[in-house]
Amino acid sequence: MIHPLSDMQALIPESTNVWQFCVILPKAQIGENCNICSHCLIENDVKIGDNVTIKSGVQVWDGITIEDNVQVGANVSFTNDRYPRAKNPNWILEHTKICKGASIGAGCTLLCGITIGENAMIGAGSVVTKDVPAGELWVGTPAKFVRKI
């Protein structure tokens, strides 16, 4: 279902839901059975797998890959520019990958150029500055290893 108040510019499967006030740019790739909640922006160079939930208020910038069965909590902040400036002719797009089954808690900030491993969990409000290995729980500002899950 595509809510009539969303700006859907990409082709997505019928099994995926996009709620009101979302903007999805034309080259974004979104898989089956996803749920994109209200007030989300998904740019062009974005790949989203199957069975992904993206809660309200998330912007998924160019260079972000989200694999299958990932949960992205409300108001998660992705980044794709290590040294942001209003105008930077030397800008380099940094890629971020969220691997299968990972869960990103509400209000997290993920700095660019990192990988969140398979089935990893990031606690709400954490700031992730480096790669998180598969099957680990990380929490805090900056996020640190808590335990294996």
Say what each PLM segment does.
Residues 122, 140:
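Conserved G/P- and acidic residue-centered "switch" motifs that form tight phosphate/ATP-binding loops
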Residues 135-137:
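Extracellular disulfide-bonded cysteine-rich modules/repeats
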Residues 105, 111, 123, 128-129:
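Short hydrophobic beta-strand segments in globular cytosolic domains
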Residues 129-130, 144:
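C-terminal intrinsically disordered extensions
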Residues 1-7, 12, 18-115, 141-142, ...:
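Flexible, glycine/small-residue-enriched loop-and-beta-strand segment within the central core
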